[in-house]
């Protein structure tokens, strides 16, 4: 099994594998091109994102700056909007449903490191997927950790750190993020 397959399947892998390093460089080059493109060139911007991400709807907008590790593990649904400074560490799948709205300075981090310092110091990593349902709004400065599923019709309040699943039809806030009421 290749290191890339291990990574995508959530197994311990070596992020310094030559193929993975080259994949990250390709993604960083596309992010650089996207982030430095004239804002008026909307069609060119869309083409870069479509070539970078694993799947997109037809209607999306990502404000620069945007950064990801690989891109091919990210899927965004129809009517996706992200404000400035979105970071997606997509060592495995990060899936967004339709009608997703993301405030500024948000991060979605699938990358995990062993708690054991000897394994961690060897450079080993693993990843856990993130799944976001339909009709979800993230306030600014939200962080979502790998292994989390966020249901449909959810609002995540600004500054929240999401470490556990959030059920459908919820408003959730805080660090750690917790449901405060149903909608």
Q: What function would you assign to each model-found segment?
A:
Residues 137, 155, 171-173:
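Short-chain dehydrogenase/reductase
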Residues 1-59, 177-180:
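Terminal amphipathic alpha-helical/low-complexity segments used for targeting or macromolecular assembly
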Residues 4-5, 52, 122, 129, ...:
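Short secondary-structure boundary/capping segments
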Residues 66-150, 175-183:
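Flexible, glycine/small-residue-enriched loop-and-beta-strand segment within the central core
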Residues 57, 133, 167:
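Short conserved AdoMet
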Residues 149, 163-164:
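Active-site/ligand-binding-proximal alpha/beta "capping" segment
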